[in-house]
Amino acid sequence: MSERLILGENAIYTMNGEINDNILVIGGSGSGKTMSLAEPYLLETYASSIVVTAVKRRIIEQYAPLLRSRGYDVLDLDLAHPDRSDVTYDPLAYVESTADIAHLASAIIDSDPRKAYSSADPYWDKAATDLLKALIKAVLIRRSIGISAGATFADVLWLFDELSFDDKGGGRISTSLDGFFEQLAWSDTDGCAKRWFSSFSNLPIRTAGCVYSQLATLLSEAFTQELRNMMQNSSRALDLTQLANQKTALFITISPIVSAHRVFANLLYSQLFKALFELNGSRPLPVPVKILCDDMAAGGGIHGLPRILSVIREKGISVMALLQSEGQLNECYGHSAQSIFDNCDSLVYLGGMDVRTAQHISQRLNTGLEDVLWMPVGREYIFRRGQRPVKTVRYNIQSNSLYQQLLRNYKVSQEVYGCDTLRDN
């Protein structure tokens, strides 16, 4: 069955048409983004793999049975309770080359939610990235020569935990890992580990302290002990390429209040996009992949997302991103936010209290600002490239017979199995 795109009442479109299938959904809290757009997106998933970030367990519990009935392998990555996940994720599992190392380190630094508000010298980011690259490279070298055969990203974090430094005079530093990297040089054939580490160890003491403090805060918050434990469990390791080769639904559950989960999820997304792009040459993926990302700009940026959105169509990848306001995206991605808007051929506005967003919507509509700000709850504007804007009522999913059946089944399961039907059933 072909997949449809339900954007509103009597606003149903076909996927894979003349325009791209990237969709931005903007609406304030409680505007109906999940029920009127995200859940219909799931209902209409028949042939594509899908990755869903959600803050409510209800989403996976309600839709997993439906997707399994359609032949999907449903994977549950619960970052709020990693020990309960049926798959695990280790960022180091997708690192082989120097380019992979650079990508992972940059993705971690870019995922810092404080970057939007920071006035720190951009050089600090480069120095922190080089330090992280050095630690990743060191762990990979040790793994390749058999010292740490089962090394994971948790080993990279452990190595950082071991790092300390003192003033050796003249404003320069000596570190607790100087000897470690000297010994490693025998196996560091391209010299990258030593060179990257030297960019940190040669810093003045005050600058080194700032770089170290910035990176320590990010790593301690983004990689909780529970997530470190999960990364060390390789028996249920997630294979990101599976999404491109068979119908798969990956649900990523995050806490609505723990920013570390969003940072970790954004890191996964950055590696997912890279892994999918490297498959099948320049040809489309065997199985199209849809990404449904709730509150996409709420926890730091996804590394390279503006550029990624401009080219993912050729691979058969599409994104539905849910936001509360345009300002949220601007804070996260800065000037690159405009590129994200430009590469989403569908925009749905459900209303909200953000005046700047309303101003931009009124400009798109060529109408007065008050018409947008005073739009009744339950109404929405739909913008599609090459078409006139549509003002309509948001989709009432509760009138959908399939949704009604899913809801009945979910309620029965709740009564029989308790609070988490997937784990108790």
Task: Please place each PLM-identified region on the residue numbering.
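P-loop NTPase motor domains
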Residues: 3-10, 14-317, 332, 359, ...
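A short, sequence-level motif marking secondary-structure junctions
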Residues: 81, 394-401
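Conserved H-loop
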Residues: 324-328
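Conserved AAA+ ATPase "SRH/arginine-finger" region at the nucleotide-binding site
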Residues: 347-354
